């Protein structure tokens, strides 16, 4: 299993409960696909450098997880079609040297 991290930006006009539900939806997707969530860090609402889909700010979330490339591909597919996510980036973390 490889280490990945995903940062995604949620629409700022969602209620707090809806924002929490979006985060839980993606962490549940990772575990359902056989991955393991190691860290969830909600950075909160921040101003973006430029306008994205007519939004000047967004709710930032960082999730670190372990999984196969198939887990990352499925997560990317779902993030891409989600209306609540305005931007995302999945990166593979380097393995720690022993």
Swiss-Prot record:
InterPro entries: Ribosomal_bS6, Ribosomal_bS6_sf, Ribosomal_S6_plastid/chlpt, Transl_elong_EF1B/ribsomal_bS6. Binds together with bS18 to 16S ribosomal RNA. GO terms for molecular function: small ribosomal subunit rRNA binding; structural constituent of ribosome. It holds the Pfam family Ribosomal_S6. Keywords: Ribonucleoprotein, Ribosomal protein, RNA-binding, rRNA-binding. This is Small ribosomal subunit protein bS6. It comes from the Bacteria. GO terms for biological process: translation. The keyword RNA-binding applies. Coiled coil: none annotated. Belongs to the bacterial ribosomal protein bS6 family. One of its GO terms (cellular component) is ribonucleoprotein complex. SUPFAM superfamilies: Ribosomal protein S6.
């Amino acid at each position: 299993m490889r280490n990945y991290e995903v940062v995604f930006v949620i629409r700022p006009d969602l209620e707090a409960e809806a924002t929490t539900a979006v985060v839980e939806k993606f962490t549940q997707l990772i575990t359902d696909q056989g991955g393991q969530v190691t860290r969830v860090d909600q950075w909160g609402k921040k101003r973006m450098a430029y306008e994205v889909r007519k939004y000047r700010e967004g709710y930032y979330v960082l999730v670190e997880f372990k999984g196969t490339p198939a887990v990352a591909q499925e997560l990317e597919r779902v993030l891409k079609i989600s209306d609540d996510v305005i931007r995302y980036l999945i990166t593979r973390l380097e393995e720690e040297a022993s």
